[in-house]
Amino acid sequence: LHFDGMYEGSLFYGTRFDDSLSVDKLYREGVITENDITDVDKYVKEKLSYILHGDINHYDGLKRIRNKEIAKRMGLKNTPYFQTTENGLISQYRMSSGECLLISLLHFIYNALIRRSLPVDKPILMLIDEIELALHPVAVSRLIDLINSIMEEHENLVVYLSSHSPE
């Protein structure tokens, strides 16, 4: 069984850690340069900022590897994001677990649904396990609001969420 647009963003194993050590090493050794990095899409920056902090500008310094081809050339499976700090860049893998997972989820949503890389005439199934994991309850509520608004705009989208939270 094949699903287009499959993304697994596990917290403890799986794709999240495939690139973690590689990205740190590539950045530390100067392999990842300013030419390889660009500002993130406004959608991802603003949604991440709002969901986690209640404003749309908190992650103004968020960057990402320019494209999949550059990431693949570096041996990376994903397109990592970076936050600008006084001391340089911090990869999403060194940010909080909630930030890291939400960046990956928003990247997927933006590319698959907003930019429409997935077909609009076929059903899209999105499964999000333990949506509350590593997120503040207010952030979970804001994320669910975003998912609801996306579902209203995309009739072919079905989303299933799981939670172990009593809230």
Where are these regions (language model features)?
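Switch/communication elements of ASCE P-loop NTPase nucleotide-binding domains
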Residues: Y93-E167
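Extended helical coiled-coil dimerization/tether regions that scaffold
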Residues: F17-C100, H107-S117
